[in-house]
Regions:
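Conserved class I S-adenosyl-L-methionine
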Residues: 37-46
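Conserved SAM-binding loop of SAM-dependent methyltransferases across substrates and taxa
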Residues: 47-60
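Non-catalytic substrate-recognition/targeting regions of SAM-dependent transferases
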Residues: 1-21, 29
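Conserved SAM-binding motif I beta-strand of class I
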Residues: 61-66
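C-terminal catalytic and target-recognition region of SAM-dependent MTase-like enzymes
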Residues: 106, 133, 147-204
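Mobile active-site "lid"/loop adjacent to the S-adenosyl-L-methionine
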Residues: 107-137
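Helix-to-beta-strand junctions that scaffold the AdoMet/dcAdoMet cofactor pocket
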Residues: 142-144
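S-adenosyl-L-methionine
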Residues: 70-111
């Protein structure tokens, strides 16, 4: 398949959703505009969508991280499909929290697009703590003047709850933070006003 001129492999049968998160395509295109000259970290990279948009946006370096070896294999295939053996890209099979603990302020654009932290309301409290912890680590590690793209795809987490978790993380890290964009799913993923949970993708 092709998205905005970029080719990608997708596992239609065994992959998550359709094998490629098409609901993030507008957000990937937005990231491309900010990537020029930056050192980019794509956490929970899955098939590497944000990574190859960052590559096309002339990022200085792009590092893709996922705990799944299969996801990293697919990311590397997609990078090679578009950029051959471009040395700007490196991929790591490791837990996201551990990776963030071990880096030392080397990235000035970080993407946090984790799988759903909560699928049921009884998991909501733990999910919000998880979002706060993850974003706090990113705020602590990002370079001054850096840009963070952060998302939640948990239906049971409202936009307001996610924002509060991110704001709490910013306060905890004692970093000055401004919102540049409020992000969501594209128009072909409409939200029924009688089913607000349909607005499952929230981002800043």
């Amino acid at each position: 398949p092709v998205e905005n001129g970029l080719k990608f492999h997708a596992d239609w049968l065994k992959g998550q959703k359709t094998g490629f998160f098409i609901d993030q395509r507008e957000n990937r295109a937005l990231l491309e505009k900010y990537a020029h000259g930056r050192d980019v970290l794509n956490m929970f990279c899955y098939t590497g969508g944000f990574s190859f948009y960052a590559m096309r946006g002339n990022a200085r370096s792009v590092h893709s991280v996922d705990s799944s070896a299969k996801a990293i294999e697919l990311t590397n295939k997609n990078i090679a499909l578009n950029f051959e053996d471009d040395p700007r890209h490196k991929a790591f099979t490791v837990d996201a929290f551990k990776f963030l603990d071990d880096i030392d302020g080397q990235y000035d654009l970080i993407v946090l697009d984790p799988p759903a932290f909560a699928k049921h309301k009884d998991s909501l409290r733990n999910a919000l703590r998880g979002y706060q912890k993850l974003n706090a680590k990113a705020f602590e590690q990002i370079k001054p003047g850096g840009i963070l793209f952060t998302f939640s795809c948990s239906q049971v987490v409202t936009k307001e709850q996610f924002r509060l978790a991110v704001f709490s993380a910013a306060a905890q890290s004692k970093r000055k933070v401004r919102i540049l964009h409020q992000l969501t799913q594209p128009a072909d993923h409409p939200v029924n006003i009688y089913h607000p949970e349909g607005e499952y993708l929230k981002g800043l």
